[in-house]
Amino acid sequence: MERTKDKRLEELFESGVPVYSISRLDCINRCLAEAYETYINNNRGESNIYALCGSKVHDVLEGIVNGENTETDLLPAVEKELEEAEMLGYEFPKMPDGSDGIRTKWVNDMQHFCATYKSPNPKNLSTEKLFIYKSPKGNVLQGYIDLQKKNEDGSIDIYDYKTSSLYTGSNIKEHGRQLVVYQMGLEQAGETVRSVSWIFLKYVEIRFMGKKTVKSKEKTEISKVVERCKIGYEMAKYVEQVMIEQGFDEVDIDVALTEFKQSNSFSVLPESVSIEFKMLPYVCKYEVTDEVKQECEEYIDKTIEMWESLGDDESNYPPLKFTKIQKNGKEVSDIFYCTKLCSHGKTCKYLHDYLDKLDNGTKDEFDDLF
C-alpha cells in the first residue's frame, strides 16, 4: 500500500542528510556488489516469489486492521499473487531431487494461515508506523513498523510479520536488529516499548494439557510450536492419547488420525477432542537488553562508516563469497542466495564469471534459474 509523505523525512532529504534503513545496512554487509548495484547505480533489479507473495500478505493484513479488507480477502489475494508471479516466471527453488517440495510446503503453510486467520481487535492497533532513529554518531535510519499496539498503561508492543521460516543460530541476532531499531526509534520519540516480537505466519503455537515426560505423574500445560503443514503429523500422538483417554475405540481413532494428518485441522476431530487443543498465532518475542542495543548501535555506525569510505570505484565493492567450507574441510558452492533471492542474480557479472569456471553439474543448476 502507498505510504503518505512525512514532513520529518522530507526535511531530512531536503537538508541532504543521508537516511538509511536496516535492510540497506544488511545488504551492505551481505554483498557489497549487490549494494553497489542497488544503492549507487539505483538499480532495484528483479524481485523474487517470496518477496512478491510476502508483500501481498502484509498488504492484506494491514488492510484488515485498517478496515479496508476482511479475513476472507486473504486467501484469494495470496492465490492470485502466486498465480500471477508464476505466470511471469518467478519460481520457488527446487528440492535437490528436482521436485516442488519447497513450493508445496510454502503454499500449504500459507493456505492454512489464510483459512484460519482471525483478525485482532483493531482497537489501539496501528500499522506501518514511521520511525526515525539517530545513532550515537548521528547516523539516521528510518523504517515502518508492521503492527503496533498501544497498551492501557501507554506502553507499546511492536510486531513484525514474517512469512519466512523460523530464525535460528546467528540469524536470530541478525534479524533481531530490525526489531531493536524499531524499539530504539520509538524510544527516541518518547515512547515506552514493552515488547518487540515477530509473528511467524507459517507456524502456530498449540497449547494443551498433557504429561511432559513418560515419568510425569500429573498433566501440565504443554506448548508446541509447529509448522502449519505439519500439524497433523506433529500432533497426532497427542490427539491419539486424548482419544484413548476418552474411550474411543481403535478403529475410530485410526480414521480420525488419518483425516487429521491429511487436513492439518483440529476441526475434523470429535468436538470433545478438538476442544482440548488451543491453536494460536506464533508470536516470538525478542529480548532487547542494553547489550543488544549497544551491539546494534555499533553495527549501524560501523557499517555506515565503512560504506561511506568506499567512494565511487566499483572495484571497492566485491561480491560475497560463492563458496563455503563444510565441516569435513571440503569447499563447496554456496550460491543459493545469489541464484534464488538476490535481485541482481540474473545480471551479476561476478556470478556469471564464477559459474563459467564450474563443471557442468553446477552449471546446470544455474541454467535452471534462467
Name what the model sees in each region.
Residues 1-370:
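RecB-family 4Fe-4S metal-dependent nuclease core
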